[in-house]
Swiss-Prot record:
Job description of the protein: Diterpene cyclases that can form multiple diterpene products.
Superkingdom as given in the UniProt entry: Bacteria
Cofactor(s) needed for function: Mg(2+)
GO molecular function per UniProt: metal ion binding; terpene synthase activity
Name the UniProt record assigns to this protein: Diterpene cyclase DtcycA
Classification via InterPro entries: Isoprenoid_synthase_dom_sf (IPR008949), Terpene_cyclase-like_2 (IPR034686)
Keywords: Lyase, Magnesium, Metal-binding
Family listed: Belongs to the terpene synthase family.
Principal EC category: lyase
The protein's Enzyme Commission number: 4.2.3.148, 4.2.3.149
Gene name of the record: dtcycA
Binding site residues for Mg(2+): N234, S238, E242
Catalysed reactions, semicolon-separated: (2E,6E,10E)-geranylgeranyl diphosphate = cembrene C + diphosphate; (2E,6E,10E)-geranylgeranyl diphosphate + H2O = (R)-nephthenol + diphosphate
UniProt-listed Pfam families: Terpene_syn_C_2
């Protein structure tokens, strides 16, 4: 029940373009229940307070919206659900590191052991690991069993990149200078797991895209654009979440660390103007993805067509997940419906501005059009 002393925050998000239908996987309850069992087994729900934090991640519902196709293998969906429960916790811990005086030594040591477990789970005796690292061992072993060596290698590479990007983000915000949106965006493309999600989507998709197609610049541009749409959704909804948290007495660091807040601090404008700018970036990126997708369809293999269909579902499902997930409506796990989001979903067609790159580090995506 919502704390009566807390007035719900009304947070309006500008119109967001999404031409894809919404759906949810029929096994959503199973994914959630088994995911919570996984986290409980590995010691993350030892107290009621811990259990509330984990449950609030809502990973089962997120995965069910990302991948609604009932034909997707449930064991793969479950592995991704368990992965999200654990790694959302790790992702949230970066803010504690940013606000501490310990620097990067702790995260580097933690990430190094994680990477070794992901790379060679069979080289470690599970019974000799603590519960936390047993969870990593479990995920790494299941991933290797459930997919091809090629897909597993792609996943490991992306996990490595995600860890390195988290270290870069921690270092960026631990510096004393004012962080600029232009610095933050290229790092956030990786830390929000956009590139990791490219390979997670490939893991879920039963077909394996041939290497020459997979590594083509146009396919990578389309995949990165699709997942960056999810990045912008995250930044828009996280802006509301962070605004609510900063209004609480327990808020730590009040420096902006979200794309919306960074743009607002950089321009001196209003929150509404910064939200509108990020929403426009997002909508233009949707349009870029659609244009690249249309061009790829002409020569795509059946496996690539299946993968593009997965991307469509993730774009739509991610928007729905943010609009419904307790992770965003209940920021601390103790105040259900603390934030009342009012998003506007539209299927209106793209504007001409959609063909203009939005930032130099990702301009190469637009360069793949008509190539």
């Amino acid at each position: 029940m919502t704390d009566p002393a807390v007035t719900p925050l009304a947070f309006s998000i500008p119109q967001l373009y999404c031409p894809f239908p919404t759906a949810i996987h029929p096994e959503v309850d199973t994914l959630t229940r088994a995911g919570m069992d996984f986290m409980t087994h590995h010691g993350f729900c030892n107290t009621e307070a811990d259990r509330l934090v984990v449950a609030n991640i809502d990973a089962g519902a997120i995965v069910a919206r990302w991948y609604p196709n009932p034909d997707f293998p449930v064991d793969r969906l479950q592995m991704v659900t368990d992965f999200l429960y654990l790694y959302f916790l790790i992702d949230d811990l970066r803010f504690e590191v940013i606000n501490s005086d310990t620097g990067l030594a702790g995260p580097i040591a933690l990430f190094a052991q994680h990477l070794d477990l992901w790379e060679y789970p069979q080289a470690h005796r599970r019974e000799e690991l603590d519960l936390f690292h047993q969870a990593i061992h479990d995920l790494a072993s299941r991933m290797a069993e459930l997919t091809t060596p090629t897909k597993a290698a792609r996943m490991r590479r992306s996990i490595n990149g995600w860890f390195l990007a988290l270290l870069r983000e921690i270092a960026l915000f631990n510096d004393d200078h004012a962080v600029m949106a232009e610095e933050y965006l290229p790092i956030r493309v990786v830390t929000v797991a956009s590139r990791l999600m490219i390979d997670v989507n490939g893991f879920i998709c039963p077909a394996e895209v041939p290497g020459d197609e997979w590594y083509s610049l146009k396919v990578q541009a389309a995949a990165e654009a699709a997942m960056s749409v999810c990045l912008y959704d995250n930044e828009l909804y996280s802006a509301g979440k962070e605004q609510w948290l900063k209004s609480r007495a327990t808020a730590h660091d009040r420096r902006p660390r979200n794309l919306v807040a960074l743009i607002q601090a950089q321009t001196g404008g209003s929150t509404e103007h910064a939200l509108q700018e990020v929403a426009e970036y997002r909508n233009r990126t949707v349009c870029l993805y659609l244009n690249l997708r249309s061009q790829l369809e002409k020569t795509a293999s059946p496996a690539l067509l299946a993968y593009l269909s997965v991307l469509d579902g993730v774009i739509s499902g991610n928007l729905d997940a943010h609009a419904t997930s307790s992770r965003y409506h209940n920021p601390d796990g103790h105040h259900p419906h603390a934030i009342a989001f009012t998003p506007l979903r539209t299927t209106d067609e793209c504007s001409a501005r959609a063909h203009t790159p939005i930032a130099p580090p990702i301009a190469w995506w637009w360069e793949q059009l008509d190539q």
